[in-house]
Each structure stands twice: as structure tokens, then as C-alpha cells.
Amino acid sequence: MNKKDQLQRLIDKYKSDIDYYRSARYNETQLRTDFLDQLFLILGWDITNAAGKPTNEREVLVEEGLKARAGENTKKPDYTFRLFSERKFFLEAKKPSVDISTTIEPALQVRRYGFTAKLKISVLSNFEYTAIYDCSNQVKETDSVANSRIKLYHFTELVDKFDEINNLIGRESVYTGHFDNEWSEIENKILRFSVDDLFLKQINDWRLLLANEFLQIKNELPEEKLNDLVQNYINSIVFLRVCEDRDLEEYETLYHFAQDKDFQSLVKKLKSSDKKYNSGLFSLEYIDELLSNANSCIWSIIEQLYFPQSTYSFSVFSSDILGNIYEIFLSEKVRIDELGNVKIQPKEEHIDRDVVTTPTHIVKEIIRNTVVEYCKGKSDIEILNSKFADIACGSGAFIIEAFQFIQDILIDYYIQNDKSKLQQISEHTYKLKFEVKREILCKCIYGIDKDYNATKACTFGLLLKLLEGETTETIGKDTPILPALDTNILFGNSLIDSGDKVKQEDIFSINPFDLTNYQFDVIVGNPPYMATEHMNQLTPKELDIYKRKYKSAYKQFDKYFLFIERSIQILKEYGYLGYILPSRFIKVDAGKKLRKFLSENKYLSKLISFGSHQVFKNKTTYTCLLFLNKENHDNFSFYEVKDFKKWLTREDKYLLSSTYQTSSLDSDTWVLEKKINDILKLMFSKSEQLGNIVGKSNVANGIQTSANKYYIHKEIKSENGFIYFEYDGIEYHIEKELTRPYFETNRSGDDSFYTYKDVEPNSFVVYPYKKVGERIQFIEYDELKRQYPKLFEFLQVVKVHLNDKKRSIKPDPTGPNEWYRYGRSQALENCDVDQKLIVGILSNGYKYSIDNHRTFVSSGGTAGYSIINIPNNVRYSIYYIQAILTSKYLEWFASIYGDIFRGRFVARGTKVQTRMPIPTIDFDDPKQKEIHDTISSKQQYLNKLYSQTQKSADRDKIIFERQFEQEKIQMDYLIKNLFDLGDLDSEIPTVEDLYKNL
């Protein structure tokens, strides 16, 4: 029987006894069993888990039919439909005697469920009518029943509209990703404004109100204490309010206190809650002083937690949503300005930095590849004796999810082995008994964070998670109900131990923590991303310790490098690690030591790359999932996500996978994408590396004076062997012999540096060096004073700056009068040549320009300029090499091996340049030599055409530009034939398209 026939039979059944079904005798539980279960089975949903999926991946969660005590305000949705473990929509059932097409309360209820859970839609049905509601809008008491209602189907329409309904809420729609596409407009509304934004705004309003009141009670409160007090009170009130909606406390208890401003009853309630729940949640200071005030803000805060002032349904306010809110909450703090005004401002480490929360589906994927994998084949005893941690836990998103997954794993274990540990919720659904959940939390879950308020938020989230699904009956009579988690959620610096020679005066700011005393079976998380320069600004004393302590603290390392290394140190043998990270460590030079550490120890088991897909909301970060095992792996898996939305549905065809031998990795850049590897192999098979052609020493960085302000100047005039310039408002002149032409980038960023335009010096650099034979020598103090008196005089003027202890000169000076040496002496001989290529290191293409003026340039890490010299004995023309470097092939190569920076720039340092593949020419073969000479001549002509374009009037300029473009097309064709990549050529974007998509 096909699905439409099954549905028609169900409709006929309803019609045949419609008066009975509409009567008060027929209840909601009967409706669910007789009709709604059947309707959604027809729509493809596995209502009873007949497929035997593990608990954490059940398609449908079904609530108990009629809870004895649950009122409309404290019950959960009757059905939760999921994509694996992600909630997609709720179904709320009403008996047919409730006309959901006209009655407002059920509509408001299902919308509040969906809004609180950040769902796109939810469904309301009594079978006679089935309604689909948009859940992106705030719910107001004055809303009509039709407000936000997208669809309303009468039962007689179900067969005719079956295909449409199946497309909207059918199982196949959800599991193919069509559901998300169908409701994408609603998703966009949620991204712009959702429960997170609303609740965070409310919490911040409460913070200001409470802070002002506490300062009235005790005006000398320090900021840290004030923040702790405010957070403790908000946690306490929100906790009790959540417990009311979860049927753990009498509904509206707090509301009645607020209405009556009954401070004695509220104080009594808070103190009794301290005894009942313990765990430090209700250890509140200044209770009597705050609550005895009839005008206290606490009363309005409480009222705002109830409908209609509150849109939320706390029975479905999930821990991950609350965690996201707290993650942003933790990035700011209450501050008192110099005028005594209370404000909320970013913490120092978050100033000018976006706060991002890890998407729940990413958290779940990491848990699935670590916690679930670790627990496979283990008994309950083995699992309960294991330790799972996040050592930069923040508000606890990862360990809260780990806690849930461990519960689900043990439910499946006990269904097979010991049902006495379980409580049956409905015919096919079980939960762990409360004492087992409590045991998991106390024995298995650990979190560490350097932010004290983060540990409090994490504890709060875990305790709410512990109480999820509980009622007064299931938690029992024993008190205190909640465990103290002060030995599980720990306040300290995960990266620094007490033995790391921390000075006594820095103990409180650094907060060393002996994490090596702990050993974990699984570590998960999203560790802090912080560049070396930011660490130097915010935590310079910690930075010094990192450099001494960690192998991965190399060059311009990122803080997350250290977290990977630290996690491996404290991971047990055969333990699992799962992190979401920027993928820069795979390729940047600073990641060299980390790559060596991982490859030599063969820890890598799996790497999932998201490519250019942006995982974090409103944040441009190229990310990957890194999975390590503390055991030797001969092979590892690499996955490329081609379609992120399809990846979420686990459709393998949208995930390219490769298996590599671990021995193929070393400290060098990891290039793992199969198609990229295929292209690179083909390119290198026809080419030779630039460094091998010209010699690696001829690919060099520019000069580094370490004091450009005093060495580099704009020329006013040049006469009689002297060059005139202005410094600090005074005109000077020095011997021109000890200067060199210099090119510097204009501050406006318009540096006029372009492949097709020869370098034109725009300033000069003081050059206290001379050439003796083939060597460059520093001009000693006495010789300088004697032969170059004007430069000597000027250097005396700036001596105080050049001789500054903070200025680094390498190699170290051996005498007292070397203070005017450059900071580094590399590249001097490379700059001072008749003709060379100058390369813009950080660029978005077309930054390989020819210099004919012996121009000097500066370099600095991933910015500035570098130099390529073509020795006389090399047969390749400088113009041939310029043409190849400018091509789309080498720009693409730079994007693979170079660093990608914000603003769509790629840094191609000398390490990348030396490896660039230059198509090989057999100069003894006349045809090949002709190709070389044609490309060389055409590049010269392109440079000339561009120069004419710049100098011409508008009429001629149009013609020159047209010629230039035609010649450029011909050049592209010539170089395409040189590389001869066949069908793979289309995989390499043009230079312009490459940077559009970065």
C-alpha cells in the first residue's frame, strides 16, 4: 500500500467516528497513538525507533502522554523531530475537542517552544487541523492565532496536499537538507535576531540594574566582586525559574513573590534552595539588604521571566543555547568609570576582537568522533572510570554535550544489560536514573578555564543539564540534590604550571595550575585563537613562559598551537583529542614545530577541512576539525567538505576522502586535498623550483634597518654629491655615496607597485656600508667620521634612537660604535644589483616588478618586499620568470603554500617563492627556446604597453589598454600550454577569481 493510500485509510478512520474523537472523552494520549504517530510514520519518521538507532541519534523523541503534575506551562513538546541529534522541529498535540484553528493558547505555546529552541518552524496538530508556525518571531500576548502561521491543513486536505506536506516536514526532506533550504528565509531571520540576542540583552540590562543596587548597598565594592555578585544572583533566579518550567518547582512561585514584593518569602525560598540544591548556587551575599527594598530591581527581573514579558519556554531552553548566551556574556564585564557610572564593556582580551560561539553541530561532530569512539565496546564501569575534559571550557558547550552523549551511550548499554539503572519515559523511550547521571557528572566530566566567571557559567550549565528531564518524583527525597563541582570545574591557567618559575607578584594574574596532575581519556574543545602579537600586548609575561615551555611556540605562533601540545601531554595513552581550529597551522611557517611534533609521534587520525566555508557566524576563519589519538597511526584520514549543508546530513558524496600514510608528513606544509595534489604533481613534473634555477640565496628578503624612521627619507634635491632631506622639521644633507634608492609603500596603501610597471624609487635609505671585492662591509666609526662628515653629523642627531636598548641588532655588536648598523645585514648584496625582480610579499596578485635602479626595499615577516636575482650564468630571462610568477598558476600555488590574511591577501615569503615551479626549458631545443623567447619578449612588451597606457591621453589610452588585454590573453595561452594540465587546468581560477573566493 502506498503512502497516500495509508493516509486515506487514516482519514477514513477519523471520519467514521468523528463525533467520538471530538468529544471530551477522547484525550490527547489516545489521539497521539491513534493518529499522529501514524501520520508521521507515513511521512517517513521512525516514531518508535524500530531501526534501533543509538539514543543520541534517535529520529523522534516522544514525551510521556499525560504527566500527572505537568500543566501547560511546565510540559515539554510532545514530539521532537531530529536530524541525528539536532532538533529540527517540534510537534505539539491537542485533542480534537480543542479547535486549534481558532484557539490562541496552543498557538502561542508551540511558538514559544520553537522560538526558545531557535527552530525555524514547529507544528501544532489535533489531526482535524495541522498547522505549521514560523518560530522566528517573538511571541506576544496580543498575537492572533494566525500570527506567524504559515500553513493550515484540514484533515480532508491531507491526501491532496501530501507531497507538499512531505516536502515541508517529511523525514526525507530533513535528512537530505531540503528542509533547511525550504525554510532558509526563516533561518536568515533567526540569524539576524533570535532568543540569544533577546535574552542576552535582558541579562545585560539586569547586570546594570543589580550592579547599581549593590553599589548603593556598599559603594566600595571592587569591580571583580561586583561582577561575581551580579552573576551569582542572575544564575540563582534563572535557575529557579528554569526549575519551575521543568516541573521541579511550583510554577509561578517566584512570580507571586514579585507581585506581592514579599521579600521574606523570597529570602526564605533562596535559603531553602541553598539547602535543597547545594552546589554553591545560592550562596548569596547581601540578600536581606537587596530584597528588603520594595523598589528593588529583583522584582522586575523576576516578572520579566514570565509570559507575556518573557517569550521563552524554559522547559525547552537547551543548554547549548544558554551556553552560547553565556559565552558572549563572559566576553564583557561590569565596569565603573571615573565618574562612578556603571557600564558593560568588553574584557581586555576581547577588545577589537569578535566573540564567536561554536555551532552546536560542530560540537556534536567532535563529540561523535571522540567520546563516542572512545566508549565503543566499553562497559559501564570502564566508562564511569574515564575522564572527559575541555581545558579551555568557557561556558561549557563541549563538556555539557559530552555529558549528554555519555548519558545516551549508557542508556543503550543498560537497555541491553541492566534496566534497573533506567527509568522508562514512554513505551520506547528511557532515561538514566538521576543518581547515575549524577555519578557521570562527578566522576567523568572536567573543565578548566582561566576566567573565574566562565567556570561559574560552566558549572551552572552542567547543573541545569543534570536536571534536564527530571521532576520532583525522579530526583528523590535526598538532599542536597546537586553535587558540588569544585573538583571538576577548575579555575586556573591550563598552559602554565606552578613549576614554571612564575614570579610571586604575577601569581594572581597568571594563575598557574598544575594540570599535569590530571590525566584524561578524552579532550575536546575550541581552544583560544590568539596571535603572538596579541599575546605580547595582553599577556607578555605568559608569552615569555610559553616560549620556554612549548616546542610549538615557534616564530609567530598562535595560542591554539600550545593547547594542542598541552592536551597531548595530559592525554592518557590511547586517549582521544578533538578540536576545531583555524587550518593555518597546516601551512604557515610558524606551524613547523607543531607539524613536526604531530607527524613524528604519528598522533594524527583524522582531519576534516571546511575549505572556504565559514563555520563561525560573521567571522572569516578557515577552519578544520583535528582528531588525534595518543598512539602511533600508520595512516590517517583526510576529508574535504564540498557542501557544508549536505555534510551536516552525512551524505558521503559531498565529502571527498583520502587516506595518507603518516610517514608522508613532516614539518613542511601539509597539502592534503587530492585534486590539489594531482595538479601540483603535474606542475612539478614539467617544472623546476625557482630556488634551484637561480640559487636559493638569490631569493632573499629585503633589508631590515629596525629603525626605518631614521634611515629612510624623502629627497628634496640632490647636488654636488649630496642629497638633501628634512628630518624633524630641519633640513639636512649627507653624502649621496652612502645612500641607496628606496621604494616604500605609501601610507594610503596605494603603493603603485605593479607587475607591469617597473619599480620607481620614491625615497632613499641611509646606507653605512661599502662593497669590498664581492663582500659588503660596514663602514667603521672613524672612517665614517673622517670621510663622510655630513652623514656622521646626522647620525649623531638620531643616535639616541639608534642606540636604544630596545632596538635589536644581529649579530650582536662587538664594540661600542656599531649602533648605526642595520638591525639585520641580510640582502644588502642582493639589493645592490643592476637588475632584479622585487616581489610584494603580501598581495592579491600582480606584484612582481622589475627594478633597474638598484632600489632597496624592506621586508618584515609576512609583509614588505623580497628580491629575486637572476645570476648571469642562468639562461632563463628575467622577463620569462616575471611572466610565469605573474600567471594564475603561480598565484594559485602561493595561495596553497602561503599564509592567507584578512582582506583577501596571500603572503608568499621567500620559502614559498623558492619552491615555485617554473616550467623547464631545454635551451638546446630550438622550439622550446623559441617559446621561452616569445614569452620573454611578450612580457617586455606588456610592461611597455602598460607604461604607455599610464602616460597617454584618454583617446590613446583606450587603444593601449585594448592592446594590453589582447597581449595578456595571448600570454595566458602560451603559459597554459607550458604547464599543459589538461582538464585540470579549469580547476585553477584566474587571479581575480582566486581572490574573490578567498
From Swiss-Prot:
InterPro entries: DNA_methylase_N6_adenine_CS (IPR002052), MethylTrfase_TaqI-like_dom (IPR011639), N4_N6_ade-DNA_methylase (IPR050953), SAM-dependent_MTases_sf (IPR029063). GO terms for molecular function: DNA binding; site-specific DNA-methyltransferase (adenine-specific) activity; type II site-specific deoxyribonuclease activity. It catalyses: Endonucleolytic cleavage of DNA to give specific double-stranded fragments with terminal 5'-phosphates; a 2'-deoxyadenosine in DNA + S-adenosyl-L-methionine = an N(6)-methyl-2'-deoxyadenosine in DNA + S-adenosyl-L-homocysteine + H(+). Coiled coil: none annotated. Mg(2+) is absolutely required for DNA restriction. Pfam families: Eco57I (PF07669). Transmembrane segments: none annotated. Gene3D superfamilies: Vaccinia Virus protein VP39 (3.40.50.150). Its EC number is 3.1.21.4, 2.1.1.72. The keyword ATP-binding does not apply. Optimum pH is 9.0 for DNA restriction and 7.5 for methylation. Keywords: DNA-binding, Endonuclease, Hydrolase, Methyltransferase, Multifunctional enzyme, Nuclease, Restriction system, S-adenosyl-L-methionine, Transferase. It comes from the Bacteria. The keyword Methyltransferase applies. GO terms for biological process: DNA restriction-modification system; methylation. Monomer. In the C-terminal section; belongs to the N(4)/N(6)-methyltransferase family. PANTHER family: DNA METHYLTRANSFERASE A (PTHR33841:SF1), DNA METHYLTRANSFERASE YEEA-RELATED (PTHR33841). This is Type II restriction enzyme and methyltransferase RM.Eco57I.
